[in-house]
Amino acid sequence: ITSEEVVGWAFSPTKSKIAFTLAEVLITLGIIGVVAAMTMPALIQRQNEKATVVKLKKAYSVLENAYRLAKEENGDFSGWISGNDKIEDTRVLAETFKKYLKVSQDCGFNSGCLPSGYVKHLDGTDYVDYDSRDNEYRMVLADGTALMFHLETNDYLTCKKDEHCGSIKVFTGNKKSGYKWGKDFFILDFTHNRIIPQGHYEDRYRPFEQYCNITDHRRENGTGCAAWVIFNENMDYLHCPEKLGWDKARSCKE
């Protein structure tokens, strides 16, 4: 091959056209990569939210069924406990529930069933290190969901018919990634009759609009999200909080 042929090939119209086309492809791929980098985190977050909805709804259903069976066999929960020792009564409460649950790990009042460190408020600020508390009974279900049983008030034995006597905290996330109220950590109240997720329509203790608002910085913000997740099957309060409410839109799409 001669030098003239090489020069002619390098600068031929066909060669230039091919080079330009490859450049366009590379530019297009670069744009696609940038767009993917921008959108993938949002898509992953939405997928994680859907998984959380499924897991929390399942935990709620499992606990409701366990409570129903426990009452059928043992009567009202006030008959299970003495009312004299809050810690001992919490243990009896949790172990009674446990009989009707599939449990893979029982931590009792010890650490190990929850992430270490402080749980975060919905706005990201620290709240409490629940894994180190010694007054709440912890266990992990077969699907990895962690539970914490707690008798809330000193008059839990005589709490009124539809008022909460205690709570069951539900952790749906990964222990290695920490935990946050309203994202993977939720509260269910139990009364003499039923289990009720916090933040429901008539909740005066932790109403959704005040205690599940990512723009609010109040203490315990995020504790009022459970009912929204269970009944509306979304976590859109993380995306359009100003639009949502029990008397307003139930999702960002409305």
For each predicted feature, which ranges?
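N-terminal leader/signal peptides at the extreme start of proteins
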Residues: 1-20
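Short amphipathic alpha-helical "recognition" segments used for binding
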Residues: 8-9, 28, 68
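N-terminal single-pass transmembrane signal-anchor helix
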Residues: 16-48, 55
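Aliphatic-rich helix starts adjacent to a transmembrane/signal segment
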Residues: 40-63, 67-70, 74
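Alpha-helix exit/C-cap motif
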Residues: 64-83, 102-106
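Intrinsically disordered, low-complexity regions enriched in Pro/Ser/Thr/Gly and acidic residues
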Residues: 86-254
